């Protein structure tokens, strides 16, 4: 092959490569934009729509996003709603439940949110709430932050895009629990919204180690039931005190998954569980109502069981056992105060009315009514007074009319005559 033939072959190859590249570029441009995975830089939003609000106001105007929240204070539900701006909450798992929880807390005006997740937004997530199709390809924590700063720019949002179950990341997670608050101290609450037991055990271990109160949540694989649980180390059962079968059997969850098979998911169930979790969070942070220790949800029967689970003295988590001993010592050292008051016999007060109706005790003897007509209301009187019928205790107390007395005497005479006739017949029979 001559040199000219080689050059011609190379030129032909280059030409075909250029044509192939042109075809690929054409097909790329024809692909719907929703299927493209946008880069993080493409999805960065513009600046927040308003300036930060320094102090909450109850003024009812269209431009005040806090007026309806502050109404809780005016109605006596919450004593000081503004203290929510001093609270820091960590949300572990920003998926179907966690993303809605983060949004609700942001709308409620929480001071700071710390988000933990390592997953990315996918088109398959669109059957759930919060995320948008144009956020596909972004990390969930970044997409959540980009959305939440527009919902409420007053909330400080910190994100961590990693898996907390690895050793190094677990240490960072514990560090943020210890020093992640607005004042660089311990945070107020941890919310677990993860979808696997390994991550739940990691959160449980960290919170037991730091003596951190947290709340756990979950939705069943068939998407028609869920639960939330309040966990206070030492006082209530931790996640390891009553472990599910998968954890108790030391089964690796990853071995249970099958290719092409996924769990069911309904935005309705996730929204209900997220609502319960945030409501319990608000009651705990703002100190109103009753914080539920466990609330279940069965969508098929609209059943909401509530339970209170005590800690397991034989829990496998050593930090849980330590917290149990600390709690028992705390309870035993507190003085027992008995607030016993003698019952007072208070008279029953009945509401006055315009009809002269009075409620009296059943043992009270009614006074005889006067001959004068009773005034029922101003200008209204009875046409006549009802007669009182005497009580009939026995036949001796009966007062008979003259005709009744004659009839009674006549009946007694007949009875005596019949008795006498019967006596005479018996005597005659004896003689015979």
Curated annotation (Swiss-Prot):
GO biological process: protein ufmylation; response to endoplasmic reticulum stress
CDD domains assigned to the protein according to its UniProt record, in alphabetical order: ThiF_MoeB_HesA_family
Keyword Cytoplasm tagged: no
Polar residues bias (residue ranges): 29-44, 386-406
Region (Disordered): 25-47, 363-406
Assigned GO CC terms: cytoplasm; cytosol
Protein purpose: E1-like enzyme which activates ufm-1. Required for interaction between ufm-1 and ufc-1.
Similarity field: Belongs to the ubiquitin-activating E1 family. UBA5 subfamily.
Protein name: Ubiquitin-like modifier-activating enzyme 5
Gene source species: Caenorhabditis briggsae
């Amino acid at each position: 092959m001559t040199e000219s033939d080689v050059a011609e072959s190379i030129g032909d190859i280059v030409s075909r490569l250029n044509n192939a590249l042109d075809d690929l570029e054409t097909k790329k441009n024809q692909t719907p934009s929703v299927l493209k995975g946008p880069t993080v830089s493409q999805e960065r939003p513009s600046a927040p729509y308003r300036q930060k609000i320094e102090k909450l106001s109850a003024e009812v105007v269209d431009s005040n996003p806090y007026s309806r929240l502050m109404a809780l204070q005016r109605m006596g539900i919450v004593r000081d709603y503004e203290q929510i701006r001093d609270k820091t909450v960590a949300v572990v798992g920003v998926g179907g439940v966690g993303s809605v929880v983060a949004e609700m807390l942001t709308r409620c005006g929480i001071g700071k949110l710390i988000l933990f997740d390592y997953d990315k937004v996918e088109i398959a997530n669109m059957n759930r709430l919060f995320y948008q199709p144009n956020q596909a390809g972004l990390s969930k924590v970044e997409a959540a932050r980009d959305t939440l700063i527009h919902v409420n720019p007053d909330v400080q949002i910190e994100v961590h895009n990693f898996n907390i179950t690895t050793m190094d990341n677990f240490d960072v997670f514990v560090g943020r629990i210890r020093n992640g608050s607005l004042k660089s101290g311990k945070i107020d609450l941890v919310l677990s919204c993860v979808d696997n037991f390994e991550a739940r055990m990691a959160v449980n271990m960290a919170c037991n180690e730091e003596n951190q109160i947290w709340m756990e949540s979950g939705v069943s694989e068939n998407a028609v039931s869920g639960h939330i649980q309040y966990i206070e180390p030492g006082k209530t059962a931790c996640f390891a005190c009553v472990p599910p079968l998968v954890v108790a059997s030391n089964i690796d969850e990853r071995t249970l998954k099958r290719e092409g098979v996924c769990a069911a998911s309904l935005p309705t169930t996730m929204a209900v569980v997220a609502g319960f979790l945030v409501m319990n969070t608000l009651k705990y942070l703002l100190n109103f109502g009753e914080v539920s220790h466990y609330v279940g949800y069965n969508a098929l029967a609209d059943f909401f069981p509530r339970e209170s689970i005590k800690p397991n003295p034989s829990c496998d988590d050593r930090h849980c056992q330590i917290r149990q001993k600390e709690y028992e010592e705390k309870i035993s050292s507190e003085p027992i105060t008995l607030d016993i008051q003698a019952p007072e016999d208070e008279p029953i007060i009945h509401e006055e009315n315009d009809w002269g109706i009075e409620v009296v005790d059943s043992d009270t003897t009614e006074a005889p009514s006067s001959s004068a007509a009773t005034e029922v209301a101003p200008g209204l009187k009875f046409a006549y007074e009802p007669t009182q019928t005497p009580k009939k205790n026995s036949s001796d107390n009966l007062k008979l009319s003259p005709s009744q007395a004659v009839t009674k005497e006549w009946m007694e005479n007949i009875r005596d005559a019949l008795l006498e006739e019967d006596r005479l017949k018996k005597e005659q029979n004896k003689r015979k």
